[in-house]
Design a protein with these regions (language model features):
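Secretory targeting and sorting signals
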Residues: 1-24
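Metal-dependent phosphoester/phosphodiester hydrolase catalytic core
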Residues: 25-513
Length: 513
């Protein structure tokens, strides 16, 4: 990785000192670096942001000096898209490394690189990283949390690609000096702040990215029904402007706030990466139905009565709560995206199906309202479909919980304890850890033992590995010869994460054959 970084820096330096023609317009700068994404065997999306309206040319070559055959793609950038450029480049050759840059006269961007996916007909190994939850908000000129060191460690893995899995900004961070983002300019500014972290821009430059949003790109825990329409539109526009995501989306669902950003990427014959949009179509939460008469919210409504009493809860949740949580008319994905997911799972020939999920699908009962457990009917439908069709090696790759949590996925851990899939939760990059959040919530409730109770709930469900107090990312590796895949959780120093309660247990998982 160091050799690649040195090469890119050298190429960028040579380009930067090229003379500007006499009489040229003011030099163009590229304050947020470059990025590539949504890579296929034959195409990629290239991204940058200029500092002014202009016409850029994207140059793409297998030669890092751009001296040999170079493809060129012009693109106008305007204030209407905050001077961002997004260019789909094609046709490319499968399983090749490409270098790219943007130019305007003598102004040249940093050089980025990506690798195209191998042909879907051929066996191919793949090694990629994923994480999410990056609050780069500054407090008096200093990071509220850290310098995104987790992303530096992830870059050092030399991954084939990076999955930027939700909460790519915190538009509603408690540390924002002007309060939550509301206007389009507010949201755009949050992306510019995060791009001020070299550890993020260096990773985006060094490999390609598959990105999806979660809630903090708009506002915490938003759904498609109750979200303010203008804030939703502003947050979505800013996300699409600032991430290398293909803007032309292929699914249409009139029942959603907007078309879901569902995509599927094949990496050789062995791996599918299925990206879900779990915000654009979801029904409203049902917290009001799960609130007791005294105004307190049920902390674990789906936990069986004996376990509820063990944790000091009433034997039963409020009347109507479970019916609301399991209402089959409520949706998490929307009917069109749900059917697209089931179709891909059923008919994909890939040995491994990695489902990129913004929120956790495993059961751990505590405050289920904003994740899959809070939409019980659709969750059960998808898991039962996987089981009924004997679909193997389905693995959910997840963030959002601000913790490492690895476990089997069941329809019901107690009533139907047959493993159907696996889930590996990682993160965060830069925000409060789960342990910090739970401790603060417990303090507000007057319960100093809430962290211990949550750990007890994880013990109850037999969590394979957990660490609630670490910044982390995950490394996924597919071995086509052995027919296996592995997932390894690592911290911001690149060290393997271990279970918080069993230090000898490494947070790793083997999938397949």
């Amino acid at each position: 990785m160091r050799r690649l970084g040195t090469l890119l820096a050298t190429v960028a330096l040579v380009a930067a000192v090229s003379p500007i023609p006499a009489g040229a317009a003011a030099p163009v700068s590229f304050p947020d670096g470059v990025a590539s994404g949504d890579v296929t065997p034959v195409s990629a999306v290239l991204w940058t942001r200029a500092d002014q309206a202009t016409t850029l040319t994207a140059e793409v070559s297998t030669d890092p000096s751009f001296a040999l055959r170079t493809l060129r793609f012009p693109e106008s950038v305007t204030a209407s898209a905050d001077f961002t450029a997004k260019i789909v480049v094609a046709p490319l050759v499968p399983n090749h490394r490409y270098f790219y840059r943007f130019r305007h006269d003598g102004s040249v961007s940093p050089v980025g690189t990506f690798k195209t996916a191998p042909s879907p007909l051929l066996p191919a190994g793949v090694r990629f990283v994923y994480t999410g939850d990056s609050d780069g908000t500054m407090v008096n000129g200093h990071p509220a949390f850290n310098n995104f060191e987790t992303l530096a460690a992830a870059r050092n893995e030399n991954p084939d690609f990076f999955v930027y899995l939700g909460d790519t900004i915190y538009a509603d961070s408690v540390f924002r000096p002007t309060g939550p983002a509301v206007t389009l300019d507010d949201y755009r500014a949050a992306y510019r702040v995060n791009r001020g972290y070299p550890n993020l821009t260096d990773l985006l430059r060094a490999t390609s990215t598959y990105a999806i949003w979660d809630d903090h790109e708009v506002v915490n825990d938003f759904d498609s029904v109750t979200v303010d329409p203008q804030r939703y539109a502003n947050g979505r526009q800013a996300f699409l402007e600032n991430l290398p995501v293909e803007t032309v989306l292929r699914l249409h669902d009139a029942g959603c706030r907007s078309d879901p950003m569902f995509r599927v990427f094949r990496w050789g014959r062995d791996a599918d990466v299925i990206v879900l949009d779990e915000r654009s179509c979801r029904s409203a939460e049902v917290k009001p139905a799960c609130t007791f008469a005294n105004g307190s919210l049920d902390l674990a409504p789906t936990l069986p009565p004996p376990a509820r009493m063990q944790f000091g809860l009433p034997a039963n949740p409020p009347p109507g709560c479970l019916a609301a949580l399991n209402d089959p008319t409520r949706t998490y994905l929307g009917s069109v995206q749900k059917q697209a997911l089931l179709t891909v799972l059923r008919w994909s020939p890939a040995r491994f199906k990695f489902v990129v999920s913004e929120d956790a699908i495993q059961q751990f009962y505590a405050l289920p309202y904003d994740r899959w457990e809070g939409y019980g009917a659709e969750r059960a439908e998808i898991l039962n479909f996987i089981r009924a069709n004997a679909i193997r090696n389905v693995t959910f790759l997840t963030t959002d919980e601000h913790a490492v949590m690895m476990n089997q996925v069941f329809v019901d851990r107690f009533a139907d304890p047959q493993p159907i899939a696996y889930e590996a939760v990682t993160g965060p990059i830069a925000t409060f850890t789960s342990q910090q959040q739970i401790a603060a919530f417990g303090q507000a409730l007057g319960d100093p033992n809430l962290v211990a109770k949550f750990q007890g709930a994880l013990n109850l469900v037999g969590e394979d590995c957990r660490n609630l107090n670490v910044n982390s990312y995950a490394v996924v590796a597919v071995d086509p010869v052995a027919g296996t895949a592995s997932i390894t959780m690592k911290d911001s120093n690149g060290a393997v994460v271990h279970d918080q309660l069993a230090a000898s247990t490494a947070c790793t998982a083997a999938i397949g054959p």
